[in-house]
């Protein structure tokens, strides 16, 4: 399989997406193994295209993957552009198409039309179902940081990507004020651990809920916190953590929700009163005027706020698996999941 494998790293069409699935240092390691790597130029990617050229990558124009030979495997992170209507290549990215998300069926139909294959990175898992490459830690870190800053009235917009050191310096100033009561739901997974780390930098010791606490949610206890960070990975519909009626509870202290999971268009949404994302230009949305007022943060590419750190960690996880793309058991599981979902979508 290695002899036939050719990787093509595409430009991300989302203007705020500065991450890379493969960083230059890891591209070099694959090239040294005899795997050709093409990288599209990208005006916003955090790693300059010259860094890829310096390690032996072939450089291509942004969006030129659509004309790439069939044997190229197209690797990205977020959504594809709307064209072409028929997808003929093997694609590796986060498709967000299997849990009833908006646009999921349309994406799968594009693969049906072109005969291509989606290797969805969310479903690149080991035999126990644990994801092998994920941005969760950095999503949690960014989501926790934004929640703290908004609670203190220090979240400015539009959001700008930053280095972790700069963000940490801003968070550290939070230690000068009285710490809010913060709750992390799903505190012990990747996202939750990242949120815990961000809050620790701000001098906040959160309440941490795991599986046991979320089997039967104590909503009164949840509403007694100032900040809620939702970091739970849900794959099947379940009773929500909060409902619209709960937001009107006269005893509610909750004033900031950071929805890191951000399953806003899915039946798996554990915060169903929120059905749309917020954005870098408008990171918060008022859910109710209160008293007290309640705002939500629901940004679906949080790790892009820390693009360098997030990319380096993700690439280190993904690179060993890219070397066996399509042939190893984790990729075979991805393929089987794709064909199962393709059949379900009709």
Question: Where are the language model's segments positioned?
Answer:
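An N-terminal-biased, well-structured beta-alpha scaffold segment characteristic
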Residues: 3-110
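Phosphate-coordination loops involved in phosphoryl transfer and adenosine-cofactor binding
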Residues: 4, 88, 178-181, 254
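Adenosine-phosphate binding glycine-rich loop
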Residues: 117, 122-170, 262-346
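Rossmann-like adenosine-cofactor binding region
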Residues: 211-290
């Amino acid at each position: 399989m290695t002899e036939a494998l050719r990787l093509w790293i595409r430009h991300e069409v989302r203007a705020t997406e500065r991450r890379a699935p493969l960083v230059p240092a890891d591209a070099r390691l694959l090239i040294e193994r005899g795997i050709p790597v093409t990288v599209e130029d990208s005006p916003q990617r955090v790693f300059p295209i010259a860094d890829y050229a310096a390690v032996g990558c072939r450089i291509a124009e942004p969006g030129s993957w659509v004309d790439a030979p069939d044997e190229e495997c197209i690797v990205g992170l977020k959504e594809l552009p709307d064209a072409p209507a028929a997808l003929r290549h093997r694609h590796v990215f986060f498709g967000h198409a299997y849990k009833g998300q908006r646009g999921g069926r349309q994406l799968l139909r594009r693969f049906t039309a072109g005969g291509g294959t989606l290797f969805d990175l969310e479903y690149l898992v080991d035999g126990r179902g644990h994801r092998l490459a994920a941005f969760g830690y950095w999503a949690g870190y960014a989501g926790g940081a934004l929640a703290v800053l908004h609670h203190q009235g220090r979240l400015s917009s539009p959001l700008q990507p930053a280095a972790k050191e700069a963000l940490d310096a801003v968070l550290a100033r939070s230690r000068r004020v009285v710490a809010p009561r913060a709750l992390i739901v799903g505190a012990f997974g990747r996202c939750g651990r990242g949120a815990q780390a961000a809050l620790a930098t701000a001098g906040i010791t959160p309440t941490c809920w795991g599986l046991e606490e979320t089997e039967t949610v104590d909503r009164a206890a949840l509403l007694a916190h100032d900040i809620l960070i939702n970091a739970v990975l849900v794959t099947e519909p379940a009773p929500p953590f909060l409902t619209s009626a709960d937001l009107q509870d006269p005893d509610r202290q909750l004033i900031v929700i950071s929805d890191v999971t951000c399953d806003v268009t899915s039946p798996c949404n554990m915060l169903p009163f929120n059905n749309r994302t917020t954005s870098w230009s408008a990171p918060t949305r008022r859910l109710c005027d209160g008293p007290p007022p309640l705002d939500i943060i629901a940004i679906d590419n949080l790790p892009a706020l820390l693009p360098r750190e997030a990319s380096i960690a993700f690439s280190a996880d993904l690179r060993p698996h890219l070397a066996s793309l399509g042939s190893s058991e984790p990729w075979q599981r991805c393929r089987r999941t794709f064909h199962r979902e393709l059949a379900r979508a009709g």
